[in-house]
Amino acid sequence: MGICLICEQGADNSALSQLAERWGLVHDENAIMALVLTPQHLELRKRDEPKLGGIYVDFVSGTMAHRRRFGGGRGEAVAKAIGIKKDYLPTIVDATAGLGRDAFVLASLGCHVRMLERHPVVAALLDDGLQRGYQDEEIGGWLQQRMTLLHASSITALADITPQPDVVYLDPMYPHKQKSALVKKEMRVFQSLVGADEDADSLLSPARVLAKRRVVVKRPDYAEPLAGVAASAAITTKNHRFDIYPC
């Protein structure tokens, strides 16, 4: 796909070329979206709205590190919805990985998570964050064991992936109401890149076939159930709910 590729001063231009080849990215000088390699990380920018800043994946520091250390742990809604209990740590396929945040929370609690991401730019961002995380002394060991990335379309991969996971987790893109600065920033940049998941409804059926225990679907609190199929149960938070479909 076409995107503006930028190598900042101090970054490795050959690494950017290799990255573009790996993910099938073609430089387009006029593209609004830019993938920027800085000396620290790979990030996504919206060139016509520079004040939004860059979006990148960081499992080592910042928000995700704080959430790992001081978040709700097993009390987090996503952990409850997945079904983590005592010694039971389900295996998970996160079929709409995005920036990998929920997958990271679940991996930090001990679950093995295989992430699927079909968009090459998002997959590149996520892989960059994973590679830096793998090298970290504190989290690198378990991160390599518990979080892996597959660049593939969920619709086809859900029919082929082996072994079967206990849980399939879905968090498809949905048009967000503008409630917070974070949502405004990330959703404006992300939706400019990938748009809404127009085919999201088609994920539920193959997910239910694949999962051994349950499918969990994260939805905004105002959104209808995925594919119009009512869930058997749900875990709710202030802005979201996690719809649960037993298998």
Swiss-Prot record:
Gene3D superfamilies: Vaccinia Virus protein VP39, YhiQ-like domain. Pfam families: SAM_MT. It comes from the Bacteria. Its main location: cytoplasm. S-adenosyl-L-methionine binds at R101, D102, E117, R118, S153, S154, D171. It is found in: Cytoplasm. Its EC number is 2.1.1.242. The keyword ATP-binding does not apply. GO terms for cellular component: cytoplasm. It catalyses: guanosine(1516) in 16S rRNA + S-adenosyl-L-methionine = N(2)-methylguanosine(1516) in 16S rRNA + S-adenosyl-L-homocysteine + H(+). GO terms for molecular function: rRNA (guanine-N2-)-methyltransferase activity. Keywords: Cytoplasm, Methyltransferase, rRNA processing, S-adenosyl-L-methionine, Transferase. InterPro entries: 16SrRNA_methylTrfase_J (IPR007536), SAM-dependent_MTases_sf (IPR029063). Specifically methylates the guanosine in position 1516 of 16S rRNA. Belongs to the methyltransferase superfamily. RsmJ family. This is Ribosomal RNA small subunit methyltransferase J. It comes from Photorhabdus laumondii subsp. laumondii (strain DSM 15139 / CIP 105565 / TT01).
